[in-house]
Amino acid sequence: MPVVAVIDYEMGNLHSVCKGLEKAGATPIITHCHQELTKADAVILPGVGAFDPAVQSLRSRDLEQPIKDTIASGKPFLGICLGLQILFESSAEGNQPGLGIIKGKVRRFVWEPGITIPHMGWNQLELTQPKSILWEHLPPQPWVYFVHSYYVDPFEPQVRAATVTHGTQTVTAAIAHENLMAVQFHPEKSSNIGLQILSNFVSQVREKIAA
């Protein structure tokens, strides 16, 4: 089975991500060791919490460069929730620079009548890259589970793989560019749809190994 390294920097619900990967047919290893990232067939960067502590935690474990090297190598990489946001250059939530792997900023939802912040619960995706491997075998507007007050705003709109609408605000819900994929929602909390997304990621890992 493909080995997927799940980065542990004390900012994620790693157990449920790992359970989802096991159901998807992968062997997850929880690690903050860059040698393990190098050996793994793919890497996942999960994350819940605040932007500044997350990037500080990654940097204190000397994980910034290994993450950049992993993505540059062409190895399949998936960011989840905060693990999407810290790939960007900066966030309205904090003062620390992000990893800057994707050009753009993290912005906060603007309050408007009839919505709650954080955006929490089930919502439908609008697939802007419908042919992305992440969305294989999914219905056209799948329901997934969100918990976030901030969203990513990529400088290059073509990296968007899906959007979501909260109130009148339509924002990026996922990005995909070559081997780099990341989602704002929680696939591990998104029932069968989320499991299919993780399975699609693992399928891509298998294809990469076979090649």
From Swiss-Prot:
Annotated active site: 81 (nucleophile), 186, 188
Superkingdom classification of source: Bacteria
Catalytic activity: 5-[(5-phospho-1-deoxy-D-ribulos-1-ylimino)methylamino]-1-(5-phospho-beta-D-ribosyl)imidazole-4-carboxamide + L-glutamine = D-erythro-1-(imidazol-4-yl)glycerol 3-phosphate + 5-amino-1-(5-phospho-beta-D-ribosyl)imidazole-4-carboxamide + L-glutamate + H(+); L-glutamine + H2O = L-glutamate + NH4(+)
Listed GO biological process terms: L-histidine biosynthetic process
Protein name: Imidazole glycerol phosphate synthase subunit HisH
Keyword Ligase annotated: no
Recorded GO CC terms: cytoplasm
Subunit organization: Heterodimer of HisH and HisF.
UniProt KW Aminoacyl-tRNA synthetase keyword: no
Localization in the cell: Cytoplasm
Pfam families attached to this UniProt entry: GATase
Swiss-Prot/TrEMBL keywords: Amino-acid biosynthesis, Cytoplasm, Glutamine amidotransferase, Histidine biosynthesis, Hydrolase, Lyase
NCBIfam families, alphabetized: IMP_synth_hisH
GO molecular function term, any single one: glutaminase activity
Annotated EC: 4.3.2.10, 3.5.1.2
Gene name of the encoded protein: hisH
Glutamine amidotransferase type-1 domain segment(s): 3-211
Task performed by this protein: IGPS catalyzes the conversion of PRFAR and glutamine to IGP, AICAR and glutamate. The HisH subunit catalyzes the hydrolysis of glutamine to glutamate and ammonia as part of the synthesis of IGP and AICAR. The resulting ammonia molecule is channeled to the active site of HisF.
Pathway: Amino-acid biosynthesis; L-histidine biosynthesis; L-histidine from 5-phospho-alpha-D-ribose 1-diphosphate: step 5/9
